[in-house]
From Swiss-Prot:
Changing residue 52 to K: Decreases methylation by host PRMT6; almost abolishes methylation by host PRMT6. Changing residue 53 to K: Decreases methylation by host PRMT6; almost abolishes methylation by host PRMT6. The cell attachment site mediates the interaction with ITGAV/ITGB3 and ITGA5/ITGB1 integrins, leading to vascular cell migration and invasion. This interaction also provides endothelial cells with the adhesion signal they require to grow in response to mitogens. The Cys-rich region may bind 2 zinc ions. This region is involved in binding to KAT5. This truncated variant has a premature stop codon. It may have arose as a consequence of tissue culture passaging. HIV-1 lineages are divided in three main groups, M (for Major), O (for Outlier), and N (for New, or Non-M, Non-O). The vast majority of strains found worldwide belong to the group M. Group O seems to be endemic to and largely confined to Cameroon and neighboring countries in West Central Africa, where these viruses represent a small minority of HIV-1 strains. The group N is represented by a limited number of isolates from Cameroonian persons. The group M is further subdivided in 9 clades or subtypes (A to D, F to H, J and K). This is Protein Tat. HAMAP family: HIV_TAT (MF_04079). Transcriptional activator that increases RNA Pol II processivity, thereby increasing the level of full-length viral transcripts. Recognizes a hairpin structure at the 5'-LTR of the nascent viral mRNAs referred to as the transactivation responsive RNA element (TAR) and recruits the cyclin T1-CDK9 complex (P-TEFb complex) that will in turn hyperphosphorylate the RNA polymerase II to allow efficient elongation. The CDK9 component of P-TEFb and other Tat-activated kinases hyperphosphorylate the C-terminus of RNA Pol II that becomes stabilized and much more processive. Extracellular circulating Tat can be endocytosed by surrounding uninfected cells via the binding to several surface receptors such as CD26, CXCR4, heparan sulfate proteoglycans (HSPG) or LDLR. Neurons are rarely infected, but they internalize Tat via their LDLR. Through its interaction with nuclear HATs, Tat is potentially able to control the acetylation-dependent cellular gene expression. Modulates the expression of many cellular genes involved in cell survival, proliferation or in coding for cytokines or cytokine receptors. Tat plays a role in T-cell and neurons apoptosis. Residues 48-58 have a biased composition (Basic residues). Interacts with host CCNT1. Associates with the P-TEFb complex composed at least of Tat, P-TEFb (CDK9 and CCNT1), TAR RNA, RNA Pol II. Recruits the HATs CREBBP, TAF1/TFIID, EP300, PCAF and GCN5L2. Interacts with host KAT5/Tip60; this interaction targets the latter to degradation. Interacts with the host deacetylase SIRT1. Interacts with host capping enzyme RNGTT; this interaction stimulates RNGTT. Binds to host KDR, and to the host integrins ITGAV/ITGB3 and ITGA5/ITGB1. Interacts with host KPNB1/importin beta-1 without previous binding to KPNA1/importin alpha-1. Interacts with EIF2AK2. Disulfide bonds: none annotated. Zn(2+) 1 binds at residues 22, 33-34, 37.
Length: 86
């Protein structure tokens, strides 16, 4: 390896940047284009802001699952709660 100028920042070292720009393509060649492409495209890791998903609302006429659970009878405890008598 050839010596690198110590005054250069690490991201400006020769060979640290690919000669071509990154693309939005997800083919194998583009996924291994550079370290950033590999992390975002091949591994699927992105640290950007996540888009908030809209909650899917149930139709007006249907009941929610939570309401149907509250109408169920409570389970009866079996046996004496204080323990067996001997």
């Amino acid at each position: 390896m050839e010596p690198v100028d110590p005054r250069l920042e690490p991201w400006k070292h020769p060979g640290s940047q690919p000669k071509t720009a990154c693309t939005n393509c997800y083919c194998k060649k583009c996924c291994f284009h550079c370290q950033v492409c590999f992390i975002t495209k091949a591994l699927g890791i992105s640290y950007g802001r996540k888009k908030r998903r809209q909650r899917r609302r149930p139709p007006q006429g249907s009941q929610t699952h939570q309401v149907s659970l509250s109408k169920q009878p409570t389970s009866q405890s079996r046996g004496d709660p204080t323990g067996p008598k001997e």
